[in-house]
């Protein structure tokens, strides 16, 4: 495979993702010249998020269920967000852990491409540090790829979570980024975050 940015070859690094319930022989493909992430190889198939998955996904939020979707979430959460849209501490943005086993993960699809995700800690899930249980669904993480920001997808997260948990209070994990605080404040005031 060739890097689309600089037309150089890629090198493969094997990843052990079994702890995330991701099956298969997984290799991360990085350009040998520009050292940037290119794609993931799953067994003999290449998974490139810049290619379209038009045959499978509508323009909407979809709950993660399949092995391929777990890999897509891994790429968004552990590679794209961290390496291409580097979290900015001054905006209270932080790197994310991969979602816990009982978390609900939703991926946003637009024109057949995964453009972001959000995760929810379900009501009753144990808080590891205190052994208490969440008393309401909690929005834990949220991310939209930089190329798709300022197009209403952040506000959509709040609308989607409210739709999925009607008649329930919804919490937010902390720290909460400045951007999500803006969306949350706009949603509760009725003005929207955009």
Show which residues each predicted segment covers.
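Short beta-alpha junction loops
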Residues: 175-178
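Non-catalytic substrate-recognition and accessory regions of acyl/acetyltransferase enzymes
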Residues: 1-137, 163-173, 184-194
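Conserved acetyl-CoA-binding loop-helix of GNAT-fold acetyltransferases
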Residues: 141-163
């Amino acid at each position: 495979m060739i890097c689309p940015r600089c037309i150089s070859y890629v090198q493969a690094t094997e990843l052990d993702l079994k702890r995330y319930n991701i099956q298969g022989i997984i290799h991360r493909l990085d350009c040998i010249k520009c050292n940037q992430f290119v794609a993931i190889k799953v067994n003999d198939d290449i998974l490139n998020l810049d290619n379209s998955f038009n045959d499978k996904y509508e323009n909407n939020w979809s709950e993660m269920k399949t092995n391929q979707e777990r890999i897509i979430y891994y790429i968004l959460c552990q590679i794209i967000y961290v390496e291409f849209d580097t979290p900015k501490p001054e905006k209270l943005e932080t790197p994310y852990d991969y979602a816990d086993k009982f978390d609900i993960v939703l991926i946003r699809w637009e024109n057949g491409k995964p453009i972001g995700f959000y995760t929810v800690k379900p009501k009753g899930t144990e808080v590891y540090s205190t052994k208490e249980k969440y008393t309401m669904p909690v929005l834990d993480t949220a991310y939209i790829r930089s190329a798709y920001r300022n197009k209403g997808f952040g506000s959509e997260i709040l609308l989607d979570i409210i739709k999925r948990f009607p008649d329930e209070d919804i919490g937010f994990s902390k720290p909460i980024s400045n951007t999500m605080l803006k969306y949350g404040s706009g949603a509760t005031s009725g003005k929207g975050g955009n």
